A protein has these predicted regions:
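Short acidic/polar hinge/loop motifs at secondary-structure boundaries
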Residues: 107, 114-140
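Surface-exposed extracellular loop regions of Gram-negative outer-membrane beta-barrel proteins
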Residues: 248-262, 366-368, 373, 427-434, ...
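Gram-negative outer-membrane beta-barrel transporters
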Residues: 343-345, 350, 413, 417, ...
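A beta-strand signature from Gram-negative outer-membrane beta-barrel systems
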Residues: 128-171
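Membrane-embedded beta-barrel scaffold of Gram-negative outer-membrane proteins
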Residues: 194, 287-291, 297-315, 460, ...
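Transmembrane beta-barrel wall of Gram-negative outer-membrane proteins
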Residues: 167, 174-209, 214-252, 276-293, ...
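Conserved C-terminal beta-signal and adjacent last beta-strands/turns
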Residues: 187, 243, 469, 505, ...
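Face-selective signature of the C-terminal outer-membrane beta-barrel domain
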Residues: 237-245, 278-435, 458-460, 518-522, ...
Length: 705
């Protein structure tokens, strides 16, 4: 039995060529494709740490609300559900991104080739529509440097491509804490996609609501996703992309250790200040692909979007008294656009197969950032949770222009070289329109640039066993959010914050075992000028500083195995030792301390019986070691182990398919912390996870045959 999984753009311009050797190595065993080039390159033959989770696995017996549900099988990826839809998931890769108080940091993310990461490096998972995902592709290690402003890795989400026959599917899920999801999806195609005029389409929409596990954590989320492909002629294709999300979420905030132990569901400051957040995002893209000759291809992606955010925070009136204080309400409107174009040429050099990809990536974002007081005075007393007087008004511009070159060279039948370089240029320009007595003009600008090389040698010990060694230099600038606040309540942008640079070395092994794949990687990353949290006050406001030197080193193991026709086993183990190599604490010596927000050990195993129809069942076990909450390592979230079980039944009759399932998570009702807010100044580090919780769901689909 052959299992094919595809990893398309943007990985297509990471490893752009399909080598004859890679095609010859494919057998009837499991094959994972990691480029969109003709013929593809199997995951076995990719000289990098790449993991693929297909959409069916993401949706299998799952709520289909968050990426954290079914990505545990990816080693090196620490993804945690905050139980807080106002702050997004907490996601880090090999320790990069762990400092983020909201959104995703240190990782480049894409939806169908459109960046879900802004030019400054701030990303979001909130617009990912799990209902229509074909695959989630995760790249870790040195080659992530070739994507520019990201150090930890790359996540690419790919939408399903419609096929014949047309299909319509409706699904629903009901879970604990008043959680409900409805979804509707339609897909199809005319023709087989190879002739002029052939069209494929996928359209999906979802609605999710929840009261939330914690007090003051209710949320509503409405994502939508669409993809339309048109074959212009035998050599070219045009793809239209659309994506949107509308979120309204309360923010329960963090708890102290005592508050967590007393009542993990409480939200004392959420109720007092009515902390909440609304987000609206809409984006569209256009991708043109053309084969110029048998050896030359071009691809152009253009996109534009808008993201609006309004957040109410938990700050007292007195805290906002200083003229330089930006208030307790954040009001943002971001417009972003970009274009990525590349040309790929396949040829021979010294009679050896070689491929070159030359590209240029341009991204631009303008941000209107305003701050308001989070109260109105009623009879002289503050009424919190209301938008008050203006306290901040600025326009921030960010853009980058990055040329890049990549090559793959088959040196011998067994030895190949992959290498590339990117020149990353990033500009920030801030214009301050809120100039009043006590708050001067804080306008300013900054420019960051860096050469980012990466390379890898791969050697095929056998047709089923490859080893590789790789190196890359990463580059991570401060985001505009990290520049937005200075410590000790000082006004203006924190332009003293410098970008961090990292050097990563990795050795790895990939072995095909029957109808499965066993992968292993050892890595070390040394970083200069690491950007870390200086102080975090209240809900969603943090200031940052450079921490000198840090080191991340570890081991990743993963097994994806299928037995017979329906038995599946997945396992992943990550050991990550992330420490400061210089002192970063204001008092005391933190040299040698563990970096906060990062688990040293993570283990995931799942085993299940999943036939195409009939009864199915499975279970998973997740372990995460303790996580330090601050630089001083004086507080931490304890380690935990959770168990989940699921079962369901698939019934097919004619063109109809019905899938009904149920699941229980945290089977043994473990009390644990799901995530931490790093360096929270009031000790409110902890974001509790729910105890034992349940869910039932169903989907029904019809094929028009």
């Amino acid at each position: 039995m052959k299992i094919s999984r595809a990893v398309y753009a943007p990985f297509a311009f990471l490893l752009p060529v399909a080598l004859t050797h890679a095609q010859a190595a494919a057998t009837d065993e499991q094959t994972m494709i990691v480029t969109a080039a003709p013929g593809g390159i199997s995951e076995l033959d990719t000289p990098a740490s790449v993991s693929v989770v297909n959409g069916d696995d993401l949706r299998h017996a799952a709520p289909q609300v968050n990426l954290s549900e079914n990505l545990g099988s990816v080693p090196g990826l620490q993804i945690q559900n905050r139980q807080n839809f106002a702050q997004d998931l907490q996601l880090s890769m090999r320790g990069f991104g762990s400092r983020s108080t909201y959104g995703v940091r240190g990782i480049r993310m894409y939806v169908d080739g459109i960046p879900a990461t802004m030019p400054d490096g701030q990303g979001y998972t909130s617009n990912f529509d799990l209902n229509s995902i074909e695959s989630v592709d995760v790249l870790r290690g040195p080659f992530s440097a070739l994507y520019g402003n990201a150090s930890g890795g790359v996540i690419n989400v790919k939408t399903e491509t419609g096929e014949q026959p047309a299909k319509i599917e409706a699904g629903t899920w009901y879970g604990s804490y008043g959680s409900v999801r409805y979804g509707l999806k339609a897909s199809g195609a005319t023709g087989d996609g190879t002739q002029a005029g052939d069209v494929d389409y996928t359209v999906s929409t979802t609605r999710f609501t929840t009261h939330g596990y914690r007090d003051h954590s209710g949320a509503r989320k409405n994502p939508a996703n669409a993809k339309l492909g048109v074959r212009l002629d035998e050599a070219s294709k045009l793809t239209l992309l659309f994506n949107s999300v509308d979120i309204k979420a309360n923010d329960p905030g963090g708890l102290t250790r005592d508050e967590w132990r007393e009542n993990p569901r409480q939200s004392p400051r959420g109720d007092e200040f009515n902390t909440r957040k609304t987000t609206k995002q809409t984006q569209a893209g256009l991708r043109y692909e053309r084969a110029l000759t048998e050896n030359d291809d071009i691809s152009v992606m253009a996109y534009a979007g808008e993201r609006e955010t309004r957040q109410f925070q938990s700050f007292k009136q007195g805290f906002q008294a200083a003229p330089s204080n930006p208030g307790g309400v954040i009001d943002l409107t971001r417009h972003y656009q970009g274009i990525d174009s590349r040309w790929t040429h396949r040829d021979a050099l010294l009679s050896l197969p070689v491929s070159f990809t030359l590209g240029l990536d341009y991204e631009n974002m303008s941000e209107d950032r305003k701050g308001f007081e989070n109260y109105r005075l009623i009879n002289g007393a503050p009424q919190y949770g209301e938008k008050g007087n203006l306290r901040r008004n600025e326009r921030n511009l960010m853009w980058n222009v990055d040329p890049y070159l990549q090559t793959t060279w088959q040196l011998t039948d067994k030895l190949s070289l992959d290498a590339g370089v990117r020149y990353s240029n990033i500009w920030f320009d801030s214009n301050d329109f809120y100039v009043v007595p006590g708050n001067g003009d804080d306008s300013g600008e900054a420019n960051y640039h860096k050469w980012l090389p990466a390379g890898s040698l791969k050697y095929a010990l056998t047709d089923a066993w490859n080893v590789y060694a790789s190196y890359g230099r990463g580059f991570e600038t401060p985001t505009i959010n990290e520049l937005s606040y200075r410590s000790n309540g000082q006004s203006g942008l924190n332009f003293a914050l410098k970008p961090s640079t990292s050097d990563t070395v990795e050795i790895g092994s990939k072995t095909r075992i029957g109808n499965g794949l066993l992968t292993a990687a050892l890595f070390r990353t040394d970083t200069d000028n690491e950007i870390v949290v200086d102080e975090s006050v209240g809900s969603g406001r943090s200031s940052y500083k450079n921490a000198g030197k840090t080191r991340r080193q570890g081991v990743e193991l993963a097994l994806d195995q299928q037995f017979g026709d329906a038995w599946k086993l997945k396992a992943a183990w990550t050991y990550l030792d992330a420490t400061y190599r210089t002192n970063v604490c204001r008092t005391g010596d933190c040299n040698g301390n563990r970096m906060p927000g990062i688990a040293r050990n993570m283990l995931y195993t799942s085993f299940g019986y999943e036939p195409e129809t009939g009864w199915y069942a499975g279970g998973d076990v997740r372990y995460m070691s303790s996580i330090m909450a601050n630089d001083a390592n004086t507080d931490k979230a304890p380690s935990y182990t959770t168990v989940g079980l699921n079962t369901g039944y698939k019934f097919q009759r004619g063109n109809w398919l019905l899938d009904v399932f149920g699941r229980v998570d945290n089977l043994f009702d473990k009390s644990y912390v799901g995530s931490v807010i790093v360096n929270e100044s009031n000790g409110r580090y902890y974001e509790p996870a729910p105890g034992r919780n349940y869910g039932v769901g169903a989907s029904v689909s019809y094929r028009f045959e």
